[in-house]
């Protein structure tokens, strides 16, 4: 992974950038072929990797898979404003949405993506593109009642204090202590965290994982803070925050050394999206009534079951 990221980072503007892009495209294709060859070289008795199983239709989706192999790391785009390279940070959610366990660089994933594209009136190419992402993003946002309220020009009122409950010390992340959450949401969170630890050894081995570092935030205190910091309407904090509802939680899913647990740096978000905690949430949080905010791997909102 570091080798691929290093190549992506080497891209520059101008004629040299064009050459680097061509070079990266070639290398990405070679890496994909090498991975397949290595898997087959393990012998007939070796377990079949998921990506190899997803190569069940040889030839049909190979070109789309090759294009996805390149764009996964090299796509230059601005889906949320700041420039980003590649779409790896969003891959787990995309895999979940299109109903494919296949590696994003496999023909099987391309086939599933094409089926999704056709269902929503897009060109069924099997290639990830920005038009497809906009449809995906719309679906994810529509599942967040808070977002739909904001679209209507509403700012949801905070819950009565009697509906809030205190987190225990073991549920709070040390970097940012929080205190309150709506009672029914806290119960759902506890069930979810317990299930994650029971099902995933890596999560059970690290007591910090899935601890909460932001929950209910009093609207008046939040407004004063955003005014003081001059960051009221950016991606990181809004004047009308979903945390005012008592249904939003920021969960620790891991972080890069030297960066905050809620860093929006592209490298940070890409790292978080590949952690066992985040991948488990993508597949299972819905069982407990939680939906994600795609831009922030740590942010989840309870919408009921």
Regions from the language model: what does each represent?
Residues 1-19:
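N-terminal secretory signal peptides that target proteins for export/translocation
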Residues 20-26, 30, 34-203:
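Cell-envelope/ECM-targeting effectors and their regulatory/trafficking segments
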Residues 105-120, 220, 294-305:
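Acidic helix/loop microenvironments that form the catalytic cleft of cell-wall polysaccharide enzymes
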Residues 110-113, 133, 186-193, 210, ...:
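Extracytoplasmic/secreted envelope proteins and their assembly/folding machinery
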Residues 125, 147-148, 224-228, 262-264:
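Short, solvent-exposed loop/turn and secondary-structure capping segments
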Residues 129, 218, 243:
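Short, conserved phosphate/pyrophosphate- and ester-handling motifs at nucleotide-, phospho-/glycolipid
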Residues 197-230:
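Extended, low-complexity, intrinsically disordered C-terminal regulatory tails
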Residues 232-305:
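Catalytic cores and adjacent binding grooves of peptidoglycan-active enzymes
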